[in-house]
Amino acid sequence: FLGALLKIGAKLLPSVVGLFKKKQQ
């Protein structure tokens, strides 16, 4: 279960970081 959660997090992380960077600009 934890492994699947990490895989999902790895997929979502780039998009979350992208949105955060857009808000800063």
Curated annotation (Swiss-Prot):
Compartment(s): Secreted; Target cell membrane
Listed InterPro entries: Antimicrobial_4
Protein name stated in the entry: M-poneritoxin-Na1b
Principal place of residence: secreted
Organism: Neoponera apicalis (Ant)
Coiled coil (UniProt feature): none
Keywords: Antibiotic, Antimicrobial, Cytolysis, Hemolysis, Membrane, Secreted, Target cell membrane, Target membrane, Toxin
Keyword Ribosomal protein tagged: no
